[in-house]
């Protein structure tokens, strides 16, 4: 129950305050409460957690890289806060989840709670954008308005992995009730994601659609239908206007031109600091001497590329660890699709689609490196492993 509440509260990292000198969030307090309850229950019933799993070694490597990144960061206090929020607590939550998700029923509760979180951010943000469209106050050249998060991209980054999992459940779950719940979530979340006008989010949605089509025996027809549907959506006036800025390289609102400059400056910085990057929270300061105009350098916290994000924050060691985690997620999902109990199997194509969508979206954005996204990521890995962990004595994959 505590784990489900924590999943439902993932967007609540925006609710912040201090307990004495210690800054915290509602999400962090929920994570800590879940861990305390788990520890008490473990000691009470003298359970022995299973630490060894396909994600243990890459998780330890990621933690090691993060600890080094704290040491090399220009602001150790800020870096320690990010280490705690993006690495230590989500990874600890992962180990809690793989112990408590001992049945598909429990896993479904966690997924349902993530769905509640997704709907909670989808409806108000979509309503605000629709109101702006209705009053003709939306400027497609600029970021869409948001309610809960600071940017519309943050909404898309949170929703896209959940849309991937929900799409798989809607397609493969044999029970009608499960399909209806997943479809109901998609009916709300997909339009909300489109209304963020996030170009990276659109790429992620396209990857999910193509991936689902490729998994069907009529893949050629469905891939063609997916591409036609994507083209039709891209011609909706506000979306077409938003995308139009990206094909005009002379347009001052073309974000790809700015991204290219940012990536170039980042690569120059990494050429000089290949092992450790800029350290956790150190990207702004690290990138400043490398030719990026001052106003852009002040606004950018990450290089907006999934490879460069991990490299600049946690060094080459962290990049290797993050890539290892993604590979392990796909490997576990493939095994789960073949070997897990039938009730778990519809989850696994969704895990693969979520990883693919994250990578595609991450070509131009910042997946993982936020409080909610890191918890969502590790919860997804926990769900993937739990289906194999609890299938019976034969589940001893290392």
Regions found by a protein language model. Name each.
Residues 247-264, 276-314, 335-338:
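Long extracytoplasmic/lumenal interhelical loops at the membrane interface
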Residues 2-9, 333-364, 384:
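Loop-to-helix entry and N-terminal half of a specific, functionally important transmembrane alpha helix
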Residues 11-19, 72, 136-148, 296-309:
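Juxtamembrane membrane-water interface segments that cap and precede transmembrane helices
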Residues 34-35, 60-71, 88, 92-93, ...:
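Alpha-helical transmembrane segments of multi-pass inner-membrane proteins
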Residues 21-30, 82-86, 147-160, 311-315, ...:
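Membrane-interface micro-motifs in multi-pass membrane enzymes
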Residues 190, 195, 264-267, 273-276, ...:
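A conserved mid-to-late transmembrane alpha helix and its immediate loop/hinge
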Residues 1-68, 77-78, 102-112, 170-179, ...:
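Transmembrane signal-anchor hairpin modules in multi-pass inner-membrane enzymes, especially those
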Residues 17-20, 72-81, 194-195, 363-368:
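Membrane-interface helix caps and helix-loop-helix hairpins in membrane proteins
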């Amino acid at each position: 129950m505590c784990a489900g509440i924590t999943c439902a509260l993932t967007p609540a990292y925006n609710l912040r305050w201090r307990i004495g000198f210690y800054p915290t969030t509602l999400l962090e307090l929920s994570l800590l409460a879940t861990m305390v309850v788990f520890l008490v229950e473990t000691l009470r019933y003298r359970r022995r957690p299973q630490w060894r799993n396909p994600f243990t070694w890459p998780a330890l490597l990621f933690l090691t890289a993060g600890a080094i990144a704290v040491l090399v960061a220009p602001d150790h206090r800020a870096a320690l806060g990010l280490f705690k929020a993006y690495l230590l607590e989500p990874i600890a939550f992962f180990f809690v989840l793989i112990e408590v998700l001992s049945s598909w029923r429990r896993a479904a509760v966690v997924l349902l709670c993530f769905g509640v979180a997704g709907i909670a951010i989808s409806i108000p943000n979509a309503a605000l954008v629709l109101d702006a469209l209705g009053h003709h106050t939306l400027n497609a050249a600029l970021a869409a308005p948001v309610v809960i998060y600071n940017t519309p991209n943050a909404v898309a980054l949170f929703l896209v992995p959940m849309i991937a999992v929900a799409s798989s459940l809607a397609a493969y779950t044999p029970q009608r009730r499960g399909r209806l719940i997943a479809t109901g979530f998609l009916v709300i979340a997909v339009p909300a994601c489109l209304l963020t006008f996030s170009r990276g989010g659109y790429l992620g949605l396209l990857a999910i659609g193509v991936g689902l089509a490729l998994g069907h025996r009529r893949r050629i027809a469905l891939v063609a239908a997916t591409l036609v549907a994507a083209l039709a959506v891209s011609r909706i006036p506000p979306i077409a206007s938003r995308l139009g800025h990206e094909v005009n390289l002379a347009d001052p609102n073309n974000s790809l031109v700015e991204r290219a400059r940012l990536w170039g400056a980042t690569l120059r910085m990494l050429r000089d600091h290949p092992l450790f990057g800029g350290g956790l929270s150190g990207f702004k300061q690290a990138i400043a001497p490398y030719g990026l105009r001052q106003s852009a350098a002040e606004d950018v916290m990450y290089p907006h590329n999934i490879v460069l994000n991990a490299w600049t924050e946690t060094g080459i060691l962290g990049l290797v660890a993050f890539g290892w985690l993604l590979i392990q997620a796909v490997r576990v999902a493939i095994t789960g699709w073949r070997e897990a109990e039938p009730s778990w199997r519809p989850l696994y194509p969704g895990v693969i689609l979520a990883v693919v969508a994250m990578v595609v979206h991450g070509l131009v954005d910042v997946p993982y490196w936020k409080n909610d996204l890191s918890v969502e990521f590790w919860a997804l890995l926990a769900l993937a492993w739990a289906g194999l962990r609890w299938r019976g004595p034969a589940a001893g994959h290392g």
